[in-house]
């Protein structure tokens, strides 16, 4: 619950999904029933490092009652776009505004790039060879891994100068092995945002609207008890410049200091969950029946996605964007029922334009909206027959007593070919889907073999 103004938290909401050309006057009209503090001056737009609108803003209101009125505007439309409204506070607002925009101290030219699409098992040496002739600083490669120690397919690389980093960007879409590699501008701050939220927020924020894993996608961190962030974000380690060289992430739970010299203990305590508007790093379902898409063409639109799933009719589509305002090639699609979400999975590996699209099911039979919190975890199938909705969170990790969650390529992969029984009952309605799961599991295992 937000504290009053006397507690220093103020009365703030965060708005997401604004049209890129949105003005303060348009925001005022959208919240015409609410009293905005200081009028247009109480509307604080969030910008990317390049100075472009991110589609998000903070709005300062005059009282808690005005906040409640503003929250009722959630999912109403502005022009052709629906707008999401979330409760926030001064601490989050001040931190985000300080760390975003073209004048942010975090946007220094420090020679970082982010790689995506690396082959599973790609080593630091292969990355060095890929950038042959371009000087990488000592300990300059960071390879995120998942909680099972496997590569996420992404990496951060720091070059000796920004000029060299610019040359590295020209290798965008070149190949390592059979995979073409995408390369994006990055920064030390982007690496840091995997696990470096304001400490105060870590203890007080309730679950918010942004939650999608992915390296370098905004100011996003999760606190779910010791070690949860390590499992979700990935442990950073490995010979050529892993965080272990800096006493970071080296005790199995991520305690210690990071490569930037800060104590990380606070990142792994509490039961809080908060995000810093990367434009799409988090998606919270209202129905509990979602499909996550990966590998979208960069020019794909919401209409393209609706057409992709035709004749199914998704409830809504959320295309993700990174902190630089560019699309990530991923999206979350919400369906009205579990059956629709399962049926949508028949489009897995189908082509959209020139690219094949991977789908990941995040749906629970019988789930409803409300407190249901959707979380995409790529390595797990989060679909439980007979589970009730309410506060059930689909992101229960392996080894936490949920027998139906099987890791692709892991020892439990054989479960994918059978029914999802256990305490949740059989799942005969999924019988036609088992073969798809087996094929996906085989594909994944062959990739990491």
UniProtKB/Swiss-Prot annotation:
Omega-N-methylarginine modified-residue sites: 233
Modified residues annotated as Phosphotyrosine in this record: 246
Crosslinked residue numbers (Glycyl lysine isopeptide (Lys-Gly) (interchain with G-Cter in SUMO2)): 35, 87, 98
Region (2 X 16 AA Gly-rich approximate repeats): 234-433
The protein's assembly and partners: Part of a ternary complex containing FUBP2, PTBP1, PTBP2 and HNRNPH1. Identified in the spliceosome C complex. Interacts with IGF2BP1. Interacts with CUGBP1; the interaction is RNA-dependent. Interacts with MBNL1; the interaction in RNA-independent.
Swiss-Prot/TrEMBL Sequence repeat ranges: 234-249, 354-372, 374-392, 418-433
Keyword Disulfide bond part of the UniProt annotation: no
Entry protein name: Heterogeneous nuclear ribonucleoprotein H
InterPro entries according to UniProt: ESRP, Nucleotide-bd_a/b_plait_sf, RBD_domain_sf, RRM_dom, Znf_CHHC
Entry coiled-coil feature ranges: none
Single GO MF descriptor: RNA binding
Any one of the GO CC terms: nucleoplasm
Role played: This protein is a component of the heterogeneous nuclear ribonucleoprotein (hnRNP) complexes which provide the substrate for the processing events that pre-mRNAs undergo before becoming functional, translatable mRNAs in the cytoplasm. Mediates pre-mRNA alternative splicing regulation. Inhibits, together with CUGBP1, insulin receptor (IR) pre-mRNA exon 11 inclusion in myoblast. Binds to the IR RNA. Binds poly(RG).
Organism whose genome encodes this protein: Rattus norvegicus (Rat)
Primary location recorded for the protein, binned into one broad class: nucleus
């Amino acid at each position: 619950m937000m504290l009053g103004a006397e507690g220093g938290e103020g009365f703030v909401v965060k708005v997401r999904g604004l049209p890129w050309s949105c003005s303060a006057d348009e925001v005022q009209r959208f919240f015409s029933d609410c009293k905005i503090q200081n009028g247009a001056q109480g509307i604080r737009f969030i910008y990317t490092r390049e100075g472009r609108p991110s589609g998000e803003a903070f709005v300062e209101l005059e009282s808690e009652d005005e906040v409640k009125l503003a929250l009722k505007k959630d999912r109403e439309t502005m022009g052709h776009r629906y707008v999401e409204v979330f409760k926030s506070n001064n601490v989050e607002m001040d931190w985000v505004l300080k760390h975003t925009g073209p004048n942010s101290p975090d946007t220094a030219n420090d020679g970082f790039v982010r790689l995506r699409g690396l082959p599973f098992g790609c080593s630091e040496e292969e990355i060095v060879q890929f950038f042959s002739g371009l000087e990488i600083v000592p300990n300059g490669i960071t390879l995120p891994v998942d909680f099972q120690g496997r590569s996420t397919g992404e990496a951060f690389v720091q070059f000796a100068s920004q000029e060299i980093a610019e040359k590295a960007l020209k290798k965008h879409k070149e190949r390592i092995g059979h995979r073409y590699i995408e390369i994006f501008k990055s920064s030390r701050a982007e690496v840091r945002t995997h696990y470096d939220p304001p400490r105060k927020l870590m203890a007080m924020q309730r679950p918010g609207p942004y939650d999608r894993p992915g390296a370098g996608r905004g100011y996003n961190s999760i606190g779910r008890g010791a070690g949860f962030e390590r499992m979700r974000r990935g442990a950073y380690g490995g010979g050529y410049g892993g965080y272990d060289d800096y006493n970071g992430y080296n005790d199995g739970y991520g305690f210690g200091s990071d490569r930037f010299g800060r104590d990380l203990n606070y990142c792994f305590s509490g039961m809080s969950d908060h995000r810093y508007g990367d434009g799409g790093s988090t998606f919270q379902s209202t129905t509990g029946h979602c499909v996550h898409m990966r590998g979208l063409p960069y020019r794909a639109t919401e209409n393209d996605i609706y057409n992709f799933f035709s004749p199914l009719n998704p409830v809504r589509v959320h295309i993700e964007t990174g902190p630089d305002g560019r699309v990530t090639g991923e999206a979350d699609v919400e369906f009205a029922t579990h059956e629709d979400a399962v049926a949508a999975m028949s489009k897995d590996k189908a082509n959209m334009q020139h690219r094949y699209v991977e789908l990941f099911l995040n749906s629970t039979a019988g789930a409803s909206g409300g407190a249901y919190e959707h979380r995409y975890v790529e390595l797990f199938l989060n679909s439980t027959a007979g589970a009730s909705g309410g506060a059930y969170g689909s992101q229960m990790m392996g080894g936490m007593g949920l027998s139906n969650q099987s890791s692709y390529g892991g020892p439990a992969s054989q479960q994918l070919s059978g029914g999802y029984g256990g305490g949740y009952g059989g799942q005969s309605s999924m019988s036609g889907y088992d073969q798809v799961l087996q094929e996906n599991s085989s594909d994944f295992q062959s990739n990491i073999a």
